Amino acid sequence: KYESERILSKGVDRFYKLFNERQLLAHAELLSVIRELSEGLDDEYHEPLTVYTMIVFDKMINYNTILSWWHPGRGSLAGIFSRMHAYAWSWDHGEMNVLAEDGGWNWAAPSVLEAYEELVRLLRGVGCSPEVVLGDARDLSVLLEGEPDAIVVDPPYYDNVQYSELSDFFYVWLKRSPLSGLFPDVFLSELTPKDGEVVANRVRQEDPEREYRGMLREFLEECRGVLGEDGRLTVMFTHRSMEAWDSLVRALRDAGFRVNSAWPVHTEAIHSLHQKDKAAVRYTLVLACETRVGGPEGWWSEVRREVRDRVLEARERARRLGLPPVDELVVAFGAALGVYSGYEVVLDDESGGEVDPVRVLDEARRVLADAVVEEFDVGGLDERGAFYLLYRYYYGYPSRSGSPDWEEVRRLCLALGLDPEGLEGEGLLVRYRGRAYLATFEDREVVDPSASSVDGLHAALRAMKEGLEAVERVVEERPDLRLLARGLVSAGYERYGDVEGFPRELSNVVRLLGVLGEEVPDGQRRLDEWTG
């Protein structure tokens, strides 16, 4: 198994070993009481009350296992899947008193009841009753009656989460509960079914990418088959890897869908640990798709111009809506993919080979980079300076653990004609646990001011400790550092609003411009107003 390897390597070869003896005893006794109470319920309440009671039980055991841990910042327990969607080992686990007034059952039950009441409120006034159907998503024509108006799906994201293996943690308890009698067909197997799960799994599958793409396409083709000509498909997507993008967009296009637009939705609280510690996922991307019948064959030279126009339109739309800079990327990607997915196939003019979605996204990055450089009137910057400005514009000044995904930044480098590994060797880019951290002047002890505008800027910021003459010597050697500094301040206004909200490094850039005799504007004035 894939996720199971994490705990098998620690000697946990049975699910009961995920609990200590005290936890096992408490859970088993509670389950016995639930079973007894369930048997005494009237027929009308037997099923619903048993179902919701077991949801409470599941919530409780999630926080009472040897993989639960104490979160010192919150002063409370964190559940088994709080760090990430995985069996994350904790050497020093925490546990709760399941019968305490403010913990265990008395904590889990009210939270489940609150969620139930919210669902009831949201469904109030709906003219039909929701129906829950268990089945293979690739058999929608069998599961559904009639033609749906829309399908909204949050599919598995490539290899991001191994749902079936994680579900086994709860399944083994539910199978031993009254639910196995209420829903016998659901609990026939010893563990959850693994075959046919639409994920990329390097352990179970010989060719994970091919199998994932094939199964995803089967599902999307089934969606296309049950939707009418005016039907809509909405796909939620959070994976940032290029393989996942490529698989999803190809599958959508091949199944007969066109991406109409893409919007970022920030769906999780900032304290959500598996999001906070995994900077690759900061929002859910909602892809709005419409059905299409066939499509023309396109040549990249023509499609590329269309991509450029749509990306610039999308960026302007995002700015009018007040979306932050990083969300401009997402909206622009949606526009670019909309162009691409409208064609049956896009071919390279020289080789005649098929152009893949990744190349389209790279073109979108290149168009956005040119637009930002033009907007801030820093066209004379070298490539490193342009990259530094764009990184700060889109991602700000994050910590190492909060930095963007390495692959995402690598593609931005390539779009500007830079070698990301070369920047890494220079110490400007730091690869940290799959993320790309952009070094500040304080991180870099020795720089050659003449190497680039970024090196010049960092050298000048360091030289401020020595006085004006030292700064002027650096500026004389690399005069375009002024241009980069102005661009960074202008981007700072776009991102942070005013100088008071600037991060430390950017505040130092403002000080540097002051030392050089430049008056930095207040508020959010544009660069052309500043320099005009």
Each predicted region: which residue ranges?
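A short glycine-rich, Lys/Arg-flanked "PGG" loop and its adjoining helix->strand segment in the class I
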Residues: 213-229, 254
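The substrate-binding groove and active-site-proximal loops of carbohydrate-active enzymes
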Residues: 202-212
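Conserved, well-ordered alpha-helix/loop/beta-strand core segments that scaffold catalytic motifs
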Residues: 45, 49, 222-229, 233, ...
